[in-house]
Amino acid sequence: TGMKDFILFDIGGQDVKVVKVEKGIITDLDLNEKCAASCGRYLENMANILEVSTENLSKYSENPVELNSTCAVFSDSEHIGKIAEGAQLEELCAGVNFSLYSRLKPFINKFRDNQLILSGGVAKNKASQNYFSNDYSSVHQLESPEFNGAIGCCSFGKKMKLEIGISRH
């Protein structure tokens, strides 16, 4: 990206990582591995319940239905109840996206900057991008964000191989 000062927010299927970078140096890091309710797994579960793709789910951010369940595993019963109450699919999808954003926002609020870079599979969620753009002056999504962790591992492995002098045969 060429940026020296930014917040990297990596939202994967099972965990969330926040990295603060100042002048090109990592100055702080936090991660959440305790709960999948703030991760891609939650979006996948809810998309399955609503019988939409995660890509379709991500399109909706307007008029979200209020969802209070904080557990990715048990939130399906709340959604079924909202469907029975007559909530529209678009409102339910927006509700899922907003509930994810609501869970992520306190986690990232302790890391403030003008630039936010989203990585991990959830970075492709258009609604999340919209919500975060209200909090940051600039929101960027990495190219192929779902592979960012794997790309980093490969890059690190290549660097380590060069440092310890392993030749390629």
For every predicted segment, state its role.
Residues 10-15, 120-122:
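A short acidic Gly-Thr/Ser loop motif
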Residues 23-63, 68-71, 155:
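Glycine-rich phosphate-binding loop plus the immediately following alpha-helix
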Residues 1-9, 17-24, 105, 152-159:
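Conserved phosphate-binding catalytic cores of ATP/NTP-utilizing and phosphoryl-transfer enzymes
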Residues 40-44, 142-169:
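Glycine-rich phosphate-binding/hydrolytic loop that grips phosphoryl groups
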Residues 9-13, 31-38, 95-98, 140-150:
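Active-site nucleophile and cofactor-binding loops and adjacent substrate-binding regions
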Residues 72-112, 146:
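Adenine-nucleotide phosphate-binding core of ATP-dependent small-molecule kinases
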Residues 5-11, 28, 51-59, 83, ...:
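A polyampholytic, Gly/Pro-enriched intrinsically disordered region
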Residues 108-135, 146-149:
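Glycine-rich phosphate-binding loops at beta-strand->alpha-helix junctions
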